[in-house]
């Protein structure tokens, strides 16, 4: 709707079509966004890395995205540094003896000046605008301006200087000696030269930590001594050592914040670790065909303090840098500036104070053939109805459709004198291929991740929703507020936590997890909800893994998907074992079935609270994507064609776009919420996807083929980055951030943690204090102004101490519900489709990972598996007796890569600690009113009154014999019982639900003619046999009727013959009385005794015999006079 209103306001009277043209965008507003009384600082640009690989210079974000080549042929021997304010990279090509520079986007490459061939170090003084170089042979440090002019020698007579560094905020420079392991320091004036330390080994890498004012270095040491990074303060004291993960000598290092980055010989990767401990490691794997990276630099505003960021610069400065369409006062500039100071399309006002728009259409120099429209800073050509604008953006051509096939054009085609030409709808332009359209009016949304705002027929700009900032590419949007987003994902036997850049990778929950495939979180109460497949219940815990508690323990069979309605305060899950979708409130007390008809094997599920809809995948015999209301009504089929096994499903709540993955087709697809505009996002390179999540500009999905988590651009499916690290089967995953689930109000739960007033803003709780109070340093509590003054006076260092705690890494303290596995190593794979690690092409087996052993790398099976690293098999801890399950009170259930303990019947607990249930005291026994219940270990006995004197007598009114069996005078529970009320309606077609203890499952006893777990399928073999038997009976009946009918016809014919003869004889008798007389006389003779019976019709009867299964293939036979005849009919005629 937003797009439609904006688009119509610009193009209400324009009906022409547009083609290629340059996009023009306005400069953005200031760096702060205001929402009520709360001010949010806009997020600065993301940090990225610049490094040399081979003879090319690359850049890449620390999370592995935006990997691109800046300089193709930079030289082989290179030293380099950057100037953040200029947005430029400087480097020295030692072979060509040139100092060169290029912008961070790869444009504007130029040569600054010639240099000597012995340059051994380069550093940028970003405050004074100077370049410092060391010459190892001349032993000098030279200083020039940023254009290579005004050269002067700062220091001379040095011993082979190299690795020069500068901290202009402290007015200090540092360098090392090539031959010895010495570190030196001087001020920027070349005075106060000091040697900080001396070491026997050569210092190969030297870097500065501007934040903590420390030096970090690595040395080319003896065998076994290359595994350390050393540091000291600016005075050479407080020396510290950390161990790095590389197996060879380091080539380069960089520092940013609390992270240290490095690369090493023979390793095509960049390591990222905690600079204090060397742990919390992330490995960024680059193209395996390349050489190790060198000259690593972290580019960010804070890497060069005092640099004015473009986001913090004045409007005039930003517009000058980008030559945007801004109006600004010249009072901020040189008053003698001329019109060249204004951006293109603008000119100086008459009073020379402002830049104003130039009306190119009025100047008649626009070149448009038919129509011209002026816009601020530019113009565009228009055409009347029936004409279209040609690719030059100037000429109009009559609209003549192309004949025949025009499928190569993404939108439409016209016929011109130069041949067929692809065209685009108004507001979009043709891409470089001349076939594909892009723009606000096309499906790619102009390349904008969120909002596309048209400026003209051929130009537009991108914008973002509240809470997001437009990034440097002017297309992507990133969250501008809140904590750092992270991933939560189920890894079959545990739940893990990881930031997008692979840092803070740890296990949150692993104890008694079994098999977990379903997971989601509640942003209001900051809770994780997950389903246990092996233990058949649903739990929840805090986002840090603490305070585990069971929520739903009855009626859960095989949960494979779970979704939390963070607004309606409910949870929904799919149960493939019961073929249902169920729901409950967050307490688990109001449990109900949502969908049970026409559903086979539901798996993934997503909820849209604002649309009040459920979306799910069904992997059964008729794979499909479906939707319904939150109550299960109004079911809608989203997709059913071209599906094999749709698994995960997710919603982009900002654009109302549905995403799903198909495990067997190895594809990710997207569509509108009603199933329209369906298209494939990625194909053939997503492995075995199981689950999805969407946030910012990316789709995340889990892969079982190469156990890992992958992300791609949510619009194009490109820029694939893979994160892996000792994963088994990563399943359900979610992105945790206040903006990930819009509309969440954390103030609803315990007032958002605020003592006084809580205001929700973009998914976060903003605490305010009542009049007369001020906020405490924790931002939650409120203090009286008097207490605040005391706090500021007597405890002056407290605020500093609190700030330090807030800025320090959060400690991970394990408890009973969590493990100490916070040292997991994450790997970022940015090598495209090529997959290779230190263990060789293809890596290790599916249940193994690659580890370092000295300078070698070997495959090692994951925990819970055994083998040679290439082939690893699950260890059955239950069979081996190596589990921690108490044998008397619990049973061991083996799972892939682990096991879980489940309390036996009659016990309760967490599976490892099980206590006897006193059924008699709880009233959960099955004894009759007249019996006495006696609790036993793991069970109970029912005793009849007077039973010892009368053993074996049943108790009157005892529990049903179907549930109890006789054992002397006691009634004990049988192994088969009925199902709980939650299973009502589970068995279909007349089936009876019952619990079988031996298999620990609820099963259905189907009536004859039906089969399946829920008796949902007809027994085709039984129906076929029944049909065949019915057919045989039908055939026999038909034949029998035919035989009877034939017999009746014969009898009727015989009776007719007899009647005819009788009448004829009577007629003849009347004509010959003498003959009749003589005949009557003779009939009374002795030989006429038998002839008397034949004077009337002889009696006939037929006996039919049915042959149910004739073996000789002959029809059923008939007999005369009671005799059975094998074939045909017989008579005495």
Swiss-Prot record:
GO biological process: angiogenesis; branching morphogenesis of an epithelial tube; cell population proliferation; cerebellar granule cell precursor proliferation; epidermal growth factor receptor signaling pathway; epithelial cell proliferation; ERBB2-EGFR signaling pathway; ERK1 and ERK2 cascade
Gene: Egf
InterPro entries linked to this entry: 6-blade_b-propeller_TolB-like, Cueball_EGF_LRP_Nidogen, EGF-like_Ca-bd_dom, EGF-like_dom, EGF-type_Asp/Asn_hydroxyl_site, EGF_Ca-bd_CS, Growth_fac_rcpt_cys_sf, LDLR_classB_rpt
Carbohydrate-modified residues: 105, 118, 149, 405, 930, 941
Subcellular location: Membrane
All ranges on the Extracellular side of the membrane: 22-1035
Signal sequence bounds: 1-21
Subunit structure as annotated in this protein's UniProt entry: Interacts with EGFR and promotes EGFR dimerization. Interacts with RHBDF1; may retain EGF in the endoplasmic reticulum and regulates its degradation through the endoplasmic reticulum-associated degradation (ERAD). Interacts with RHBDF2.
Segments traversing the membrane: 1036-1057
Keywords attached to this entry: Disulfide bond, EGF-like domain, Glycoprotein, Growth factor, Membrane, Repeat, Signal, Transmembrane, Transmembrane helix
Spans annotated as Disordered: 1069-1097
Protein name according to UniProt: Pro-epidermal growth factor
Residue ranges of LDL-receptor class B repeats: 87-128, 129-170, 171-212, 213-259, 485-525, 526-568, 569-611, 612-655, 656-698
Biased composition (Low complexity): 1076-1090
GO cellular component terms given for this protein: extracellular exosome; extracellular space; plasma membrane
Organism of derivation: Rattus norvegicus (Rat)
One GO MF term attached to the UniProt entry: growth factor activity
Domain EGF-like: from-to ranges: 322-356, 357-397, 398-438, 436-478, 743-783, 835-873, 874-915, 916-956, 975-1016
Topology Cytoplasmic: residue spans: 1058-1133
Disulphide bond pairs: 361-372, 368-381, 383-396, 402-413, 409-422, 424-437, 440-452, 448-462, 464-477, 747-758, 754-767, 769-782, 839-850, 844-859, 861-872, 878-892, 885-901, 903-914, 920-933, 927-942, 944-955, 979-993, 987-1004, 1006-1015
């Amino acid at each position: 709707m937003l797009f439609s209103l904006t688009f119509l306001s610009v193009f209400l009277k324009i009906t022409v079509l547009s083609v290629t043209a340059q996009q023009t965008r306005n400069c953005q507003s200031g760096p702060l966004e205001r929402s009520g009384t709360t001010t949010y600082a806009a997020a600065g640009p993301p940090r990225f890395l610049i490094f040399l690989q081979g003879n090319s210079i690359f850049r890449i974000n620390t999370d592995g995205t935006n990997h691109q080549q800046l300089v193709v042929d930079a030289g082989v021997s290179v030293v380099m540094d950057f100037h953040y304010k200029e947005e430029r990279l400087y480097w020295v090509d030692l072979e060509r003896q040139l100092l060169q520079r290029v912008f961070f986007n790869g444009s504007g490459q130029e040569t600054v000046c010639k240099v000597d061939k012995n340059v051994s170090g380069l550093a940028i003084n970003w405050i004074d605008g100077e370049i410092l170089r060391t010459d190892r042979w001349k032993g000098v440090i030279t200083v020039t301006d940023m254009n290579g002019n005004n050269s002067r020698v700062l220091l001379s007579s040095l011993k082979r200087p190299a690795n020069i560094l500068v901290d202009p905020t402290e007015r200090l420079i540092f360098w090392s000696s090539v031959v010895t392991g010495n570190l030196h320091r001087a001020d920027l004036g070349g005075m106060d030269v000091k040697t900080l330390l001396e070491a026997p080994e050569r210092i190969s890498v030297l870097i500065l930590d501007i934040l903590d004012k420390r030096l970090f270095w690595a040395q080319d040491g003896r065998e076994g001594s290359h595994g350390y990074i050393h540091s000291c303060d600016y005075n050479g004291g407080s020396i510290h050592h950390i161990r790095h993960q590389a197996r060879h000598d380091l080539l380069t290092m960089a520092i940013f914040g609390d992270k240290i980055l490095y690369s090493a010989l023979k390793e095509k990767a960049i390591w990222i670790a905690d600079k204090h401990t060397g742990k919390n490691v992330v490995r960024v794997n680059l193209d395996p065909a390349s050489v190790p990276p060198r000259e690593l630099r972290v580019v960010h505003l804070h890497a060069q303090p005092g640099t004015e960021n473009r986001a913090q610069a004045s409007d005039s400065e930003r517009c000058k840098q980008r030559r945007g369409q801004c109006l600004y006062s010249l009072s901020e500039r040189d008053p003698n500036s001329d019109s060249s100071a204004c951006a293109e399309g603008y000119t100086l006002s008459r009073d020379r104070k402002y830049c104003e728009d130039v009306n190119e259409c009025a100047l008649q120099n626009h070149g448009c053939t038919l129509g011209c429209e002026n816009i601020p800073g530019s113009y565009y050509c228009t055409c009347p109805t029936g004409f279209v604008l040609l690719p030059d953006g100037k000429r109009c051509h009559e609209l003549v459709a192309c004949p025949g096939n025009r499928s190569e054009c993404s939108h439409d085609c016209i016929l011109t004198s130069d041949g067929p030409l692809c065209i685009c709808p108004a507001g979009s332009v043709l891409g470089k291929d001349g076939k594909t359209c892009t723009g606000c009016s096309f499906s790619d949304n102009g390349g904008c991740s969120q909002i596309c705002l048209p400026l003209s027929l051929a130009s537009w700009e991108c914008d973002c929703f509240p809470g997001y900032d437009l990034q440097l590419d002017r297309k992507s949007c990133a969250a501008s507020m809140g904590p750092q987003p992270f991933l939560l994902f189920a890894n079959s036997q545990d739940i893990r936590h990881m930031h997008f850049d692979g840092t803070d990778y740890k296990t949150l929950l692993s104890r008694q997890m079994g098999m977990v495939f379903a997971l989601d979180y509640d942003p209001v109460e900051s809770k994780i909800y997950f389903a246990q497949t092996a233990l058949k219940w649903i739990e929840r815990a805090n986002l840090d893994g603490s305070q585990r508690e069971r929520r739903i323990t009855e009626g859960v069979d095989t949960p494979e998907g779970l979704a939390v309605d963070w607004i309606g305060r409910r949870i929904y899950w799919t149960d493939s074992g019961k073929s249902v979708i169920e729901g409950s409130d967050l307490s688990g007390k109001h449990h109900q079935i949502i969908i049970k008809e026409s559903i086979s094997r539901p798996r993934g599920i997503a909820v849209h609270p604002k649309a009040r809809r459920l979306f799910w995948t069904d992997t059964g015999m008729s794979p499909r994507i479906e939707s319904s209301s939150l109550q299960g009504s109004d079911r809608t089929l989203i997709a059913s064609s071209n599906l094999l096994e749709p698994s995960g499903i997710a919603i982009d709540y900002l654009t109302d776009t549905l995403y799903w993955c198909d495990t067997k087709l190895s594809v990710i697809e997207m569509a509108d919420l009603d199933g329209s505009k369906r298209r494939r996002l990625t194909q053939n390179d997503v492995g075995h996807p199981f689950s999805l999540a969407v946030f910012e500009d990316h789709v995340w999905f889990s892969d079982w083929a190469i156990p890992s988590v992958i992300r791609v651009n949510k619009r194009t499916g490109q820029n694939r980055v893979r994160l892996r690290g000792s994963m088994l089967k990563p399943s359900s995953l979610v992105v945790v951030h206040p903006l990930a689930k819009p509309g969440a109000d954390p103030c609803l739960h315990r007032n958002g943690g605020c003592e006084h007033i809580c205001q929700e803003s973009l998914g976060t709780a903003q605490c305010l204090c009542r009049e007369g109070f001020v906020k405490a340093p924790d931002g939650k509590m409120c203090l009286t102004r008097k207490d605040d003054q005391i706090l500021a006076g007597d405890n002056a260092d407290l605020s500093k101490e609190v700030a330090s705690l807030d800025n320090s890494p959060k400690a991970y303290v394990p408890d009973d519900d969590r493990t100490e596995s916070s040292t997991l190593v994450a790997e970022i794979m940015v090598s495209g489709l090529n997959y290779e690690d230190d263990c060789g092409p293809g890596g290790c087996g599916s249940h193994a990972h690659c580890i370092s052993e000295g300078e070698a790398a070997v495959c090692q099976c994951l925990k819970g598996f055994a083998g040679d690293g290439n082939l690893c098999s699950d260890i059955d801890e239950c069979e081996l007796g190596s589990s921690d399950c108490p044998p008397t009170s619990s049973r061991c259930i083996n799972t892939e890569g682990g096991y879980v303990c489940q309390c036996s019947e009659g016990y309760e607990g967490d599976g490892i600690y099980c206590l006897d249930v006193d059924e008699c005291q709880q009233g959960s026994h099955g004894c009759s009113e007249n019996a006495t219940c006696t609790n036993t270990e793991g069970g109970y006995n029912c005793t009849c009154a007077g039973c010892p004197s009368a053993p074996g007598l049943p108790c009157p009114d005892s529990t049903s014999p179907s549930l109890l069996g006789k054992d002397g005078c006691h009634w004990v529970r049988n192994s088969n019982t009925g199902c709980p009320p939650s299973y009502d309606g589970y068995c279909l077609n007349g089936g009876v639900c019952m619990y079988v203890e031996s298999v620990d499952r609820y099963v259905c006893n189907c009536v004859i003619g039906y089969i399946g777990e829920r008796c949902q399928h007809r027994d085709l073999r039984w129906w076929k046999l029944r049909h065949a038997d019915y057919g045989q009976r039908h055939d026999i009946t038909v034949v029998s009727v035919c035989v009877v009918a034939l017999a009746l016809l014969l009898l009727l014919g015989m009776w007719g013959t007899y009647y005819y003869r009788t009448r004829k004889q009577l007629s003849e008798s009347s004509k010959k009385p003498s003959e009749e007389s003589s005949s009557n006389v003779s009939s009374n003779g002795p030989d006429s005794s038998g002839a008397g019976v034949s004077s009337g019709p002889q009696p006939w009867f037929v006996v039919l015999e049915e042959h149910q299964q004739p073996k000789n293939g002959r029809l059923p036979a008939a007999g005369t006079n009671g005799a059975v005849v094998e074939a045909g009919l017989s008579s005495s005629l």
